[in-house]
């Protein structure tokens, strides 16, 4: 009887505890909802997007399809609004004015480092990029940009062609299927490593370096942005890989110094030869961190863009035909050698890549964190408080009918005919500002900013276009291809870059 009595009391206690828990959750939800509906809003701040769940906020809707979520919010709240994502308050600033506000914000008002360093420092290592003082980071960008010059690009094109042709030789004959993102992701690592990372890294790609890169890449996910340092195996592998990559670069640098091997047309050598303004040579761990950052920035953007370009072209045989005709007309034949100079003579090819970047920007949003007591959105006087993230969203603005005719249609010719409203806004007074690494080259008020703008504009844009032009040209020369009756796949938003769904396959046939 005593046992039965104890069991009965335990069951009763459990039921009561569960009841209190349910009641507590219900009360919390009710308070959260009523606080949004009843409590007066600050009229000087952007409107808040309604959410049902405290802390989590709008994270579920945003995570499922962030572009669609932001577009719906834009219809309801306008170009500027604030939503909550796992305790973080994000103020979104859409349109050309929103781009200008976010990308031109002064360092004492908002900070990219405060937005991203908690995640990137574990992947790139200490004292580089956002983990460095801002002035030092601008010097580091200048070093990297100096290593991405026309003389190097002329040497890079034949390297990329060779790597690409060797890679394609592994494809089955006469026909077969490739998974777009996986295939071009591998190819881009090979080409980028050959041109930028150094011959030693390229020679190691089929072994340990590829595994280290994969482990680092697993530390560059949305969960790492929300929770930068959890006691999980993937986080530990990330940290080990970062240390091993730094050690690897240090050993390569030391070998080059010992053997006086300094005649290398790669970025590694350019960084080894550079010095900071105070006259000190760049420390080995700085070089390693910058090289990792360059590889990540270039590989992610070029891998996704090359995959999306091939997928879009596979759905448009008329454009494939036109691209081949352009090469025959401008270069003489489809067998003519590709060079840094003659790639400039292919405007439709560049337009096809630009159109891909418009519809499928690898980074669909870019953020800063407010570090001043408040920051004022000049257009309407709204005040955004300290601690909020401010966010520009090229993935939304670049498909806005305000700026682009038939914005969801893949139409490379829009960049040649220049009839869209976007072409009236591309340049502004800030296009020639030099933040310490050369003129940025484009106004932050442009609605087309897949590479960002302002002091944090991507410095690898020229190399990216060069790499993409060479790879895409070689692919359309080598293969006929289509989507096997299917449509262009949907976007996968589960990583930090927007990739095609992993089921996206392209059917290819070797050309004579």
UniProtKB/Swiss-Prot annotation:
Signal peptide: none annotated. CDD domains: CYP51-like. Keywords: Heme, Iron, Lipid biosynthesis, Lipid metabolism, Membrane, Metal-binding, Monooxygenase, Oxidoreductase, Steroid biosynthesis, Steroid metabolism, Sterol biosynthesis, Sterol metabolism. Coiled coil: none annotated. The keyword Iron applies. Sterol 14alpha-demethylase that plays a critical role in the third module of ergosterol biosynthesis pathway, being ergosterol the major sterol component in fungal membranes that participates in a variety of functions. The third module or late pathway involves the ergosterol synthesis itself through consecutive reactions that mainly occur in the endoplasmic reticulum (ER) membrane. In filamentous fungi, during the initial step of this module, lanosterol (lanosta-8,24-dien-3beta-ol) can be metabolized to eburicol. Transmembrane segments: none annotated. It comes from Cunninghamella elegans. GO terms for biological process: sterol biosynthetic process. It is an enzyme of class 1 (oxidoreductase). This is Lanosterol 14-alpha demethylase. It catalyses: a 14alpha-methyl steroid + 3 reduced [NADPH--hemoprotein reductase] + 3 O2 = a Delta(14) steroid + formate + 3 oxidized [NADPH--hemoprotein reductase] + 4 H2O + 4 H(+); a 14alpha-methyl steroid + reduced [NADPH--hemoprotein reductase] + O2 = a 14alpha-hydroxymethyl steroid + oxidized [NADPH--hemoprotein reductase] + H2O + H(+); a 14alpha-hydroxymethyl steroid + reduced [NADPH--hemoprotein reductase] + O2 = a 14alpha-formyl steroid + oxidized [NADPH--hemoprotein reductase] + 2 H2O + H(+); a 14alpha-formyl steroid + reduced [NADPH--hemoprotein reductase] + O2 = a Delta(14) steroid + formate + oxidized [NADPH--hemoprotein reductase] + H2O + 2 H(+). Belongs to the cytochrome P450 family. Its EC number is 1.14.14.154. It is found in: Membrane. The gene is CYP51. Gene3D superfamilies: Cytochrome P450.
């Amino acid at each position: 009887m005593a046992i039965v009595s104890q069991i009965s009391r335990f069951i009763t206690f459990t039921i009561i505890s569960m009841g209190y828990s349910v009641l507590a959750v219900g009360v919390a939800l009710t308070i959260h909802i009523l606080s949004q509906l009843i409590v007066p809003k600050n009229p000087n701040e952007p409107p808040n997007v309604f959410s049902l769940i405290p802390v989590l906020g709008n994270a579920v809707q945003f995570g499922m399809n962030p572009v669609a979520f932001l577009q719906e919010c834009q219809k309801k709240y306008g170009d500027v609004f604030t939503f909550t994502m796992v305790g973080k308050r994000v103020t979104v600033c859409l349109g050309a004015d929103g781009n200008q506000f976010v990308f031109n914000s002064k360092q004492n008002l908002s900070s990219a480092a405060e937005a991203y360093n908690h995640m990137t420092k574990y992947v790139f290592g200490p004292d580089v990029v956002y983990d460095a003082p801002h002035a030092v980071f601008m010097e580091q960008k200048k070093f990297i940009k100096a290593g991405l010059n026309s003389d190097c690009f002329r040497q890079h094109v034949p390297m990329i062609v060779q790597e690409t042709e060797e890679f394609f030789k592994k494809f089955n004959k006469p026909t077969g299927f490739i998974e777009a993102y996986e295939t071009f992701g591998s190819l881009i690592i090979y080409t980028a490593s050959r041109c930028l990372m150094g011959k030693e890294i390229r020679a190691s790609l089929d072994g340990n370096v590829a595994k280290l890169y994969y482990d680092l890449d697993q530390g560059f996910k949305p969960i790492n942005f929300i929770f930068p340092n959890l006691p999980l195996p993937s986080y530990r592998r990330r940290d080990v890989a970062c240390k091993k990559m730094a050690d690897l670069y240090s050993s390569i640098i030391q070998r080059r110094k010992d053997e006086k091997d300094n005649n290398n047309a790669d970025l590694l050598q350019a960084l080894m030869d550079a010095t900071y303004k105070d006259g000190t040579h760049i420390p080995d761990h700085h070089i390693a961190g910058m090289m990792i950052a360059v590889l990540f920035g270039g590989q992610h953007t070029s891998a996704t863009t090359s995959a999306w370009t091939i997928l879009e072209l596979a759905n448009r045989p008329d454009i494939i035909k036109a691209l081949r005709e352009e090469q025959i007309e401008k270069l003489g034949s489809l067998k003519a050698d590709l060079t840094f100079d003659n790639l400039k003579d292919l405007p439709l090819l560049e337009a096809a890549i630009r159109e891909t970047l418009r519809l499928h920007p690898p980074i669909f949003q870019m953020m800063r964190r407010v570090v001043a007591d408040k920051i004022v959105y000049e257009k309407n006087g709204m005040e955004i408080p300290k601690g909020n993230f401010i966010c520009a969203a090229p993935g939304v603005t670049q498909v806005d009918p305000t700026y682009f005719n038939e914005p969801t249609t893949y139409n490379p010719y829009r960049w040649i005919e220049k009839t869209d409203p976007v072409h009236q806004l591309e340049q502004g007074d800030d296009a020639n500002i030099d933040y310490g690494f050369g003129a940025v080259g484009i106004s932050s008020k442009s609605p087309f900013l897949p590479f960002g703008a302002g002091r944090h504009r991507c410095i690898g844009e020229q190399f990216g276009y060069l790499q993409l032009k060479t790879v895409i040209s070689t692919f359309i020369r080598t293969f006929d291809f289509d989507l096997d009756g299917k449509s262009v796949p949907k976007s996968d938003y589960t990583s930090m870059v927007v990739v095609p769904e992993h089921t996206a396959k392209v059917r290819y046939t070797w050309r004579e």
